[in-house]
Regions:
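Generic structural signal for alpha-helix termini and adjacent loop/cap motifs
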Residues: 16, 36-37, 66
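ABC-type nucleotide-binding domain
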Residues: 49-220
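Short beta-strand segments of immunoglobulin-like
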Residues: 44-46
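Cytosolic ends of transmembrane helices, especially the final helix of ABC transmembrane type-1 domains
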Residues: 5-33
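Active-site phosphate-binding and catalytic loops of NTP-dependent enzymes
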Residues: 39-42
Length: 220
């Protein structure tokens, strides 16, 4: 009896300590987010429907914590290439070779340190970020699905889409046949962050979402 009475407050203290640790982790993440600088948009040109003629002209980039004097610290160094409209281009290289960084430069998640990136002959820094990103569809490696139905998660790419357009996007992403095997079809819930689906299924739903958006530029 005495041992039980002694252990109860200790267990409470352990639980409080665990909650405090979890709270500190969340608070630290909150501070990191609040410390981030707001994006300054120097672009003034509204991009309508871009054709997708992308040109990298002697582009170099390094992350902020890199040594500016060290050439080897550049993730991308003096890159020049052209991607024509309608073409599919694969970036191949080792991990950390700059493939993801190149993709992140196009929608201006980062700004190039040197050189220029243009789309349809216009420097992307002259385009407003909102209109530029409206023309770009990105399928991230870490797919995010919200706790809703498959239909709702696909429709997030275009909230005004019809059921027929949603089905067509799913067919293009090769996920329609699987969806039709489910008892509730497109109305099947995916769970929090898509927990009820496999990694490949989540990826295909994310691809269907981008197809529904029908962007001028698609980054996978």
């Amino acid at each position: 009896l005495f041992i039980t009475m002694f252990l109860k407050p200790i267990n409470r203290l352990v639980n409080i300590f665990e909650q405090l640790q979890n709270g500190m982790t969340g608070f630290q993440r909150f501070v990191e987010i609040m410390d981030q600088k707001d994006e300054t948009d120097t672009g003034t040109i509204e991009a309508d429907a871009l054709r997708g003629n992308i040109v990298f002209d002697h582009v170099s980039f390094r992350y902020e914590n890199s040594d500016a004097r060290d050439v080897e610290s550049k993730v991308i160094h003096d890159l020049s290439m052209r991607i024509e409209p309608g073409k599919t281009v694969a970036l191949v290289g080792p991990s950390g070779g700059g493939k993801t960084t190149i993709c992140n430069l196009i929608p201006r998640f980062y700004e190039a340190d040197e050189g220029t990136i243009s789309i349809d002959g216009v420097d992307i820094r002259d385009l407003t970020r909102e209109s530029l990103r409206r023309n770009i569809g990105i399928v991230a490696q870490d797919v995010f699905l919200f706790n809703g139905s498959i239909r709702e998660n696909i429709a997030y790419g275009n909230l005004d889409a019809t059921d027929e357009e949603i089905v067509e996007a799913a067919k293009k992403a090769h996920i329609h046949d699987y969806i039709m095997t489910l008892d509730h079809g497109y109305d099947t819930g995916v769970g929090e962050r898509g927990v009820k689906l496999s990694g490949g299924q989540k990826q295909r739903i994310s691809i269907a979402r981008v197809f529904l958006k029908n962007p001028s530029i698609l980054i996978l």
